[in-house]
Each structure stands twice: as structure tokens, then as C-alpha cells.
């Protein structure tokens, strides 16, 4: 469905030489140098510019939420979507501060919102099935979600965006992400399930049990990533996965947020391994399992702030770092130009 090509290594030596000969000791800009390499490899070695950074927030509800895996009821998904639309959430403020275009997409919240022209309708249903009792969705819904996401990413690419990030909102979605992680990485539920919105020990134990039940129930369908997404995914996680693949196909930089987004990235890389080449990982969240996924994907996150809010907040905070890496790569003087000997 997606044709994601490997990022060429043809200019790696040229890019590295340009980084190494800036007016600084070798490696003195640390992770920004690695980031500059990624930017130049994806966008080209000659003055790559970050243009029209964009963040899409995908929202969807989860049937498993009715079983008490979160401190919040599923109604909060709709309430928070309205908060996004009114500009009152953390992600709104961070995007405004960073000059990031933000868009909110209803992938399948339980309570449909009407008369909100800024809300993009990508509804695949009114919440997923409860994954510990039934599949989250059909394979057809996965494919439809991919197609919708691809179209949206292509729209922003056509408008000049070459750095895209994704956030999410969905009560219960850390349960879905943990199940996806366990299925795709062959891990035990206990290694993947965390406290999400801040649940207590009893709720954590119940959440882990339900994820274990989901993995056992669908064990015959978890042999490929499409089956994993259909059985265990969320409508917002599916569309995020499709959006990551679409952006990689279009050779855009893809900024990955926290635990949920990394589960979508894991699914995307399982489908198209070269998608990994286009990814920048914004931060390591406070959610159990995120570090394991980052290690599995050989990812070095830019930030470690203990964030566990979701929404794409970590990605939005990382955009200025991406811009800074491009700026030093393009504009910092060379040792030769300045006559400096190090």
C-alpha cells in the first residue's frame, strides 16, 4: 500500500564533513549533530530548510475504557477535543508558541461533535470494540484509516510542509498501545502496561490483566501488523500509523511524540522498515514500556522531561530543536572560513 524508499547514504560523508568542520570541536553540539545528519539525509545536503511544521492530533475512543483502565471516563475524549478546538489545551499553546500548524481529526470518538468546521471528520466508528472481548475493528477499517491519513498528509505536503508530527487523544489508548507493543515486540504485558493517566496499583493490575486477555484472545491474528492493528488498535493509532507511512513515502521528516505515537511508529516500521529512516523521536515519556520501544527502534530521543500527557506535546516542544539543528548546519561558519585551528 505504501512505497517507502530507503534514505540514500550517498552524501553521508559530505554531510558529516560539513558538520565536523563548523567552528566548534568535533561532536560539541552533541545530539544536534546527529539530528542535523538526519535532516540533511532526508531533505538533501545543500541547505535543507524546515518548512511549515505541522502537527495533526488524532482522536478516537476505546471500548476497553468502559472496563476502568483510566482515571477518566471516555467522555473526556470528546471534552478534550472541544478543548483543542477552543485553543485551551497544552498542545494549542505549544504549537502557537512554536509556529506550528495544528489540526484536530476525529477518527472515531464515541460522542460525535457537530457544527465544528475546524474538526476534520475521519470517523471510522463511534469508538473501537473492547479488545479483551472482540477485535477493535475490521481489516477494512484499518485500510480505510490508512487511506484517510494518506490523503491528509498529502494535503499538507502539497502546502509545503516537510516536517510533520502527530499527537493523539483517546481515553484508554495506552492500553491499546501497550497491547500493540507486546504483540509486535513479543513482550509480556507486564513489560508494556503502565500507569497512563496516573492510575493506582489496583487499576494497573486490572489494565494488565485485560491486555493479557486481549493478547490471548487474538493470538491467531497477531502474525502480521495489519492483524495487530485490527485486533488491538485504536482508530487514532491506525490513522497515525498510516500518516507516518504516508509522510515517509513523501520523504518528509516525521517527528514522533511519546508512548502512543511510538507504538504507531513501531507498527509503521513493521509494515515498511525504511520508514524508520525518516523518523525523529521527540522525547522519552514517563510511561512504562516507552524506553523499551525506543531501544527496539534504535532511537535516541531529543528530550527527557517525564511527559505523559500525550496530545503531541513532546513533539511540539522538540520542533525548535529540529529548526536549530537545520540552522546550525546551514548557517554556522566553518573553521576554514574563520581561520580557526582546532
Swiss-Prot record:
InterPro entries named in the record: Nict_dMeBzImd_PRibTrfase (IPR003200), Nict_dMeBzImd_PRibTrfase_bact (IPR017846), Nict_dMeBzImd_PRibTrfase_N (IPR023195), Nict_dMeBzImd_PRibTrfase_sf (IPR036087)
Gene Ontology terms: biological process: cobalamin biosynthetic process
Single GO term (MF): nicotinate-nucleotide-dimethylbenzimidazole phosphoribosyltransferase activity
Highest taxon of the lineage: Bacteria
Catalysed transformations (reactions): 5,6-dimethylbenzimidazole + nicotinate beta-D-ribonucleotide = alpha-ribazole 5'-phosphate + nicotinate + H(+)
SUPFAM superfamilies (UniProt xref): Nicotinate mononucleotide:5,6-dimethylbenzimidazole phosphoribosyltransferase (CobT)
Pathway named in the protein's UniProt entry: Nucleoside biosynthesis; alpha-ribazole biosynthesis; alpha-ribazole from 5,6-dimethylbenzimidazole: step 1/2
Active site positions, chain numbering: 311 (proton acceptor)
Function text: Catalyzes the synthesis of alpha-ribazole-5'-phosphate from nicotinate mononucleotide (NAMN) and 5,6-dimethylbenzimidazole (DMB).
HAMAP family linked to this entry: CobT (MF_00230)
Family: Belongs to the CobT family.
PANTHER family assigned: NICOTINATE-NUCLEOTIDE--DIMETHYLBENZIMIDAZOLE PHOSPHORIBOSYLTRANSFERASE
Protein name: Nicotinate-nucleotide--dimethylbenzimidazole phosphoribosyltransferase
Gene (UniProt): cobT
Amino acid at each position: 500500500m505504501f512505497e517507502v524508499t530507503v534514505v540514500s547514504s550517498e552524501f553521508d560523508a559530505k554531510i558529516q564533513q560539513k558538520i565536523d568542520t563548523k567552528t566548534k570541536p568535533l561532536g560539541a553540539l552533541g545530539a544536534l549533530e546527529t539530528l542535523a545528519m538526519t535532516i540533511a539525509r532526508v531533505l538533501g545536503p545543500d541547505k535543507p530548510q524546515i518548512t511549515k511544521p505541522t502537527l495533526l492530533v488524532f482522536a478516537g475512543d476505546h471500548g476497553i475504557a468502559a472496563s476502568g483502565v483510566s482515571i477518566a471516563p471516555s467522555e473526556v475524549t470528546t471534552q478534550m477535543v472541544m478543548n483543542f478546538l477552543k485553543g485551551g489545551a497544552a498542545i494549542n499553546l505549544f504549537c502557537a508558541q512554536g509556529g506550528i500548524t495544528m489540526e484536530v481529526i476525529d477518527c472515531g470518538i464515541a460522542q460525535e461533535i457537530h457544527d465544528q468546521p475546524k474538526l476534520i471528520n475521519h470517523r471510522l466508528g463511534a469508538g473501537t470494540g473492547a479488545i479483551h472481548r472482540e477485535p477493535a475493528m475490521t481489516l477494512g477499517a484499518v485500510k480505510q484509516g490508512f487511506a484517510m491519513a494518506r490523503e491528509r498528509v498529502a494535503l499538507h505536503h502539497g502546502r509545503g510542509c516537510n516536517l510533520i508530527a502527530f499527537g493523539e487523544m483517546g481515553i484508554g489508548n495506552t492500553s491499546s498501545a501497550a497491547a500493540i507493543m507486546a504483540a509486535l515486540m513479543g513482550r509480556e504485558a507486564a513489560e508494556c502496561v503502565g500507569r497512563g493517566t496516573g492510575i493506582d496499583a489496583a487499576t494497573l493490575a486490572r489494565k494488565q490483566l485485560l491486555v493479557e486477555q486481549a493478547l490471548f484472545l487474538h493470538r491467531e491474528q497477531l502474525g502480521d501488523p495489519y492483524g495487530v492493528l485490527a485486533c488491538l488498535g485504536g482508530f487514532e493509532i491506525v490513522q497515525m500509523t498510516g500518516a507516518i507511512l504516508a509522510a515517509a513515502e513523501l520523504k518528509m521528516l516525521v517527528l514522533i511524540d511519546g508512548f502512543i505515537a511510538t507504538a504507531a511508529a513501531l507498527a509503521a516500521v513493521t509494515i515498511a522498515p525504511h520508514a524508520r529512516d525518516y523518523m525523529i523521536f521527540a522525547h522519552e515519556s514517563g510511561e512504562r514500556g516507552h524506553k523499551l520501544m525506543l531501544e527496539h527502534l534504535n532511537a535516541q530521543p531529543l528530550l527527557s522531561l517525564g511527559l505523559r500527557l500525550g496530545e503531541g506535546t513532546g513533539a511540539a516542544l522538540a520542533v525548535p530543536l529540529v529548526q536549530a539543528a537545520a540552522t546550525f548546519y546551514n548557517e554556522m561558519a566553518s573553521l576554514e572560513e574563520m581561520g580557526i585551528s582546532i
